[in-house]
Amino acid sequence: MFKKTKITILGATGSIGDSTLAVIRETNDFEVFALTAFSNVEKLAELCQEFKPKFAVVPDLSKKQKLQSLVTDVEVLVGESGLEKVSSLAEVDIVMSAIVGIAGLKPTFAAAKAGKKILLANKESLVTAGHLLIDEVVKNNAQLIPVDSEHNAIFQCIDNHDKKCLPEIDKIILTASGGPFRDKQLHELTDVTPEQACNHPNWQMGRKISVDSSTMVNKALEVIEAYWLFSVSADKIGVLIHPQSVIHSMVRYVDGSYIAQLGVPDMKTPIANAMYYPKRGSVNVESLDFTKYQLTFREACFERFGALKIVFNNLQNKNYAANIVFNAANEELVAAFLNKKIKYLEIIEVNKKVTKELNFENPKNIEEVFEIDRKTREYVDSVLG
């Protein structure tokens, strides 16, 4: 009898969760074991009714009561312990780690310690604790497969996904759309509104990640992820602005060859690739019509995109704690911008100041990661008043 692959989706109501569930609807190979959500209980209830998971996880008791009033045939768990449980139970085959922010750290580590196949969309697990997470993955024989379109592209371009080929890599080149303001100079962005920043030209994404794309913080975080995922030094990572988002990333090998992964901008492709790996599954995505595109590229200037400069400097100095500061400060500053408490350009300006002023030792465990994160947020709050 055919046995379906059981999947836990952390962050089921977000954009990655949506695309993951879209893949599941189109195929008959997966069984939803657990769904989690932070605030959108109504949507979670609808998903529970459709996919009938064994578990659902919400952050607190009031949301548990609300969910239980809407659905009755699912076991509802609460908080971090619930997230860690559904990420590590023996029945689970795959964990989609798609919670936004540092809240995704503990359940991702729980999945790694349980030796799971982890589909990683949560950037912060690598950004804030890459050295610790990779150790857990290796120690427990877990699998870590990137879901971000750029890293999944690199994953597909590396020969047999085998780290033995890493000495043959001359450069990993991450492509970036450049966001909605790629053709504007900094002085033109003084009065950018949250609505404008969230209007991404190529991808449908959540508000926070849309702002991150517009500032290129998203790409800066992806540089950190690539550093850990592919065990390469910072000088072997490059960024190119590619407005069409057709080439999702590429690898230059030492013999001068380039291997790139192409496709229309649709998150179902990298998600399906990760879900089915090492095989490929058939999903309904638009074919790439090469006659409709002219592919263009330009340099990602560090002076224009200050987030890249901050992160490359941190990696070159092996200052991993500074990346935690950068990430935490960004989350606070983006939230302040979306709530119209600061101006758009202050997101990077204040982050640059905070990253320079706060100095911590590189964390030795996950508790120290959270401590650096907490102290950074408190400091940013004090700066913003």
From Swiss-Prot:
InterPro entries the UniProt entry points to: DXP_reductoisomerase, DXP_reductoisomerase_C, DXP_reductoisomerase_N, DXPR_C, DXPR_C_sf, NAD(P)-bd_dom_sf
Pathway: Isoprenoid biosynthesis; isopentenyl diphosphate biosynthesis via DXP pathway; isopentenyl diphosphate from 1-deoxy-D-xylulose 5-phosphate: step 1/6
Recorded catalytic activity of this chain's protein: 2-C-methyl-D-erythritol 4-phosphate + NADP(+) = 1-deoxy-D-xylulose 5-phosphate + NADPH + H(+)
GO biological process terms held by the UniProt record: isopentenyl diphosphate biosynthetic process, methylerythritol 4-phosphate pathway involved in terpenoid biosynthetic process
Residues given in the record as 1-deoxy-D-xylulose 5-phosphate binding sites: 123, 149-150, 177, 200, 213, 218-219, 222
A GO term for molecular function: manganese ion binding
UniProt protein name: 1-deoxy-D-xylulose 5-phosphate reductoisomerase
Species for this entry: Francisella tularensis subsp. novicida (strain U112)
Entry's family note: Belongs to the DXR family.
Essential cofactor(s): Mg(2+); Mn(2+)
